[in-house]
């Protein structure tokens, strides 16, 4: 646990050092890194396919009958008769195939696809995804996927034991889908550009509009940008401007960013991420744990010889209570370094830090948003 506290302290020191030494570098970004074009969003594709060539780790046809039905239908489409008994081979698996169709993608370009097992297959390693059509929300086919599946995890099993590391029932096919249909796009005919901030913030939106207006005034003779809210900035197209060139110039402008202070907590893994802008008001924290251990040690009582008695079991319960911690620490400071140092002084575990942060927030001493995952 000391390594965790040292790591948190190191992160705090680095964050404060960077803020003191190079504030301009730490707080500025290109517009393309903090905002995306509304007309340039991704579209999701989905399909159903089969993976073949597995080494006995595929679906069982009894527990996954849809896999056998799909395989028979595929073979019939290839002109192969499927009449006969049921196959017991487990080298085929039914999968869902998903992909993201990037904006302005043209036919012939390739995209990555993700495959996920539907049946009781134990591993997709070594398999090959056969030709699978990928459709959009409108039901139209936009891409066709096929190729070797790459799985990061592995599995080894014997008659009495199985060892699995990572996820073996999902994988990727890099560049496995070929785009067959492009999405209708009217980017060149648009009269404005709408930028959407990835982290909505009014201050950042206003600064983007000001930076773009400064560029437009020097280039086109007048302002063209307006911040609609904390997430959207609308840029009107000047008459003499080419929209593609305008977007290329705008996305490379440097803007000073600002985000609200947050503390992100994942209670399942015990992960705690504290932003550099977190502020803490003076607060006293006491943390202690009470451990109660109940142990059952039954005693066997034997009767005296020739007494015609019976062997009996007498229950015996031992209860031990132990209280640890209980120290009081006063956290008084304006920055992240003070918060981390105060938690280190108490010497609690990650689950205790989570409880303390929630308590500090409830007391109104944590000047940040507490995000629980």
UniProtKB/Swiss-Prot annotation:
InterPro entries: Flag_FlgI. Coiled coil: none annotated. GO terms for cellular component: bacterial-type flagellum basal body, distal rod, P ring; outer membrane-bounded periplasmic space. GO terms for biological process: bacterial-type flagellum-dependent cell motility. One of its GO terms (molecular function) is structural molecule activity. It is found in: Periplasm; Bacterial flagellum basal body. It holds the Pfam family FlgI. Keywords: Bacterial flagellum, Periplasm, Signal. Residues 1-26 form the signal peptide. It comes from the Bacteria. The keyword Cell cycle does not apply. Belongs to the FlgI family. The basal body constitutes a major portion of the flagellar organelle and consists of four rings (L,P,S, and M) mounted on a central rod. Assembles around the rod to form the L-ring and probably protects the motor/basal body from shearing forces during rotation. This is Flagellar P-ring protein. It comes from Rhizobium etli (strain CIAT 652).
